[in-house]
Regions:
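Extracytoplasmic thiol/disulfide redox context detector
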Residues: 2-82, 123, 127, 145-160, ...
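Cysteine-centric redox/oxidoreductase cores and disulfide-bonded domains
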Residues: 76-164, 169-182, 186-192
Length: 192
């Protein structure tokens, strides 16, 4: 009986990805004076540029000092972006690393002949995060995860009239387009 209980516990904690808590990626203290939301699509080249050029500077200058809370939020523009965002939710505490790879290889995995090929490309990437083929399929077909990703887009449209990516919202004020760090710094420093 003891062996059965131990085996059950091992299977419970190692066999499947946990979908109980769907979280996104954030930096800084959530009670900071400045709240910056980044609405992005994982197939958007300007979002990739923002991710590599501007976001690290914002994290270093503000979020790392708890002056700003940065939320990376989903605004998928197409099915490949939707599916990539769903898989992001399944890599748990490695989402930042996942986004690095997704954005670096964006032109390879996203530019496929069809959605099945996109999904196969995403499956190959997900193996780097320990996601098995069956867990990948479960993640991709999980309705709660899909609802979470799509609700982020709906909220962005409803609350901020977001219609393109990347869109930055600083304390509920919207800024669209690929803004550079120096441009955002002007807006941010006025709020400090």
């Amino acid at each position: 009986m003891k062996k059965i209980a131990i085996t059950f516990l091992i299977l419970l904690f190692t066999s499947d990805i946990s979908f109980s808590k769907i979280t996104g990626l954030s930096y800084g203290a959530d009670n900071s004076k400045i709240n910056l939301k980044v609405y992005s699509s994982l197939t958007c080249p300007h979002c990739a540029e923002f991710h590599f050029r501007t976001l690290p500077k914002l994290i270093e200058a503000y979020a790392s000092k708890n002056m700003m809370y940065i939320e990376i939020l989903d605004f998928p523009l197409d099915y490949p972006a939707l599916n990539a965002a769903k898989i992001q939710k399944c890599v748990n505490n490695r989402q930042d690393e996942y986004l690095d790879i997704i954005y670096k290889t964006q032109s390879k995995w996203a530019n496929a002949k069809n959605l099945d090929e996109v999904n196969n490309n995403l499956k190959k990437i997900s193996t780097k995060f320990g996601i098995s083929s069956s867990d990948f399929d479960k993640c991709l077909t999980n309705k709660n995860i899909e609802k979470n990703v799509l609700q982020s887009r709906i909220n962005a449209q409803k609350n901020y009239n977001v219609n393109s990516t990347p869109t930055i919202v600083i304390n509920k004020k919207k800024y669209s387009g690929p803004l550079e760090f120096d441009e955002l710094k002007i807006f941010i420093d006025k709020l400090l």
